[in-house]
Amino acid sequence: AFSIEKVTVTAKSRALKAEYSLELAQDLKAIHGLNAEAELANILSTEILSEINREVIRTIYKVAEQGAVHNTATQGIFDLDIDSNGRWSVEKFKGLLFQIERDANAIATRTRRGKGNIIMCSADVASALTMAGVLDYTPALNANLNVDDTGSTFAGTLQGKYRVYIDPYSGGHNPGSNGGQYYVVGYKGSSPYDAGLFYCPYVPLQMVRAVGENSFQPKIGFKTRYGLVANPFAEGLDQ
């Protein structure tokens, strides 16, 4: 027999608005051939989606369990000079790869669902794996690693089983002795339900138009409602 478990998801709102003058719209159309409303709508929708993505990433950082807790000089920190036991840089980077493997194995041991298969890391960590000769770039990034400063970047596949993503804002996290360099290993199964965190949209992104009652100038806004919820069977710092 089996049972169906359920959990409550509270939908919250996220919205952005913008105002512009009719004179601006007229000049922009006459000089540059651009539609002011369309340009602002594109900016607002892109910003909202970017904020949602960052919220998901921050949530992952917050609830992720500490890795590198065994056979390291300092729990939670993998020191390339001490813990890797390598003689030169490439050997040290391969030691880092072994530690990532251990953390991926820990996910399989804890969840019994599967081994970790997603890595989100800082740019220097991805570069270290590249120098070790274990990161195969996608065709678009065959020449060099092009890190996008506006969002998480898919860097390539590690050993044919780990999808590696670079967080371009990683410099703002944990700027202590490790210089803000880190990685997070996660698991995502083949089924949509086989994950640890779910994005649950309630109301899709909607556009609203209005006119100011005093200025008679146009206003536009975008609003969406959604929730983030952990897998009821997942284990993290907040579970």
Predicted regions, residues:
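Sequence/fold signature of self-assembling virion shell proteins
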Residues: 4-23, 27-29, 34-38, 42, ...
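Extended, solvent-exposed, turn-rich assembly/linker loops in the middle of proteins
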Residues: 71-145
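Alpha-helical scaffold segments that mediate packing/assembly in large oligomeric complexes
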Residues: 22, 33-35, 39-102
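Intrinsically disordered or highly flexible coil/loop and linker segments, enriched in small
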Residues: 27-30, 49-70, 102, 106-117, ...
